[in-house]
């Protein structure tokens, strides 16, 4: 599913114009992005948590040469699905065979 698909779904289900649906979806994504940029956690009940983690710098190895290199510190985004989402995914697997 793409952002355009999400906009189309909001348009069909809520009844806003396509322009309004696009603006709402953009605002939601912008809010999520800005919150994550500040390093804050996002909890969406029944869906899951988006968490920004700090990774320390560490020594890695070039697999071709064996040379040690430093991997710089960085922030990574992780997603932990809620139990409700996990259950919904597993229930849908039981109802419909995978394609």
Curated annotation (Swiss-Prot):
Q: Which organism is it from?
A: Anaeromyxobacter sp. (strain Fw109-5)
PANTHER family for the chain: DNA-BINDING PROTEIN HU (PTHR33175), INTEGRATION HOST FACTOR SUBUNIT ALPHA (PTHR33175:SF2)
* GO cellular component terms given for this protein: cytosol
Which protein family is it in? Answer: Belongs to the bacterial histone-like protein family.
The protein depicted here goes by the name: Integration host factor subunit alpha
Pfam family for this entry, one: Bac_DNA_binding
Subunit-structure text: Heterodimer of an alpha and a beta chain.
Record carries keyword Lipid metabolism: no
Q: Where is the organism placed in the taxonomic lineage, from the top?
A: Bacteria, Pseudomonadati, Myxococcota, Myxococcia, Myxococcales
The residues the entry assigns to the signal sequence are none
State the UniProt keywords alphabetically. DNA recombination, DNA-binding, Transcription, Transcription regulation, Translation regulation
What HAMAP family has UniProt attached to this entry? IHF_alpha (MF_00380)
Q: Which NCBIfam families match?
A: himA, PRK00285.1
Q: Which GO terms describe its molecular function?
A: DNA binding; structural constituent of chromatin
Highest rank taxon of the organism: Bacteria
SMART domains (UniProt xref):
BHL
UniProt xrefs under InterPro entries: Hist_DNA-bd, Histone-like_DNA-bd_CS, IHF-like_DNA-bd_dom_sf, IHF_alpha
- Primary role: This protein is one of the two subunits of integration host factor, a specific DNA-binding protein that functions in genetic recombination as well as in transcriptional and translational control.
Q: Which GO terms describe its biological process?
A: DNA recombination; positive regulation of metabolic process; regulation of DNA-templated transcription; regulation of translation
């Amino acid at each position: 599913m793409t952002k355009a698909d999400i906009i189309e779904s909001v348009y069909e289900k809520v009844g806003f114009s396509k322009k309004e649906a696009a603006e709402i979806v953009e605002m939601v994504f912008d809010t999520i992005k800005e919150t994550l940029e500040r390093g804050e956690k996002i909890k969406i009940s029944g869906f899951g948590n988006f968490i920004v983690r700090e990774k320390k710098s560490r020594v890695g190895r070039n697999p071709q040469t064996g040379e040690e290199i430093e991997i710089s510190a960085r922030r990574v985004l992780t997603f932990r699905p809620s139990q409700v989402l996990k259950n919904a995914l597993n229930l849908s697997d039981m109802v419909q065979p995978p394609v």
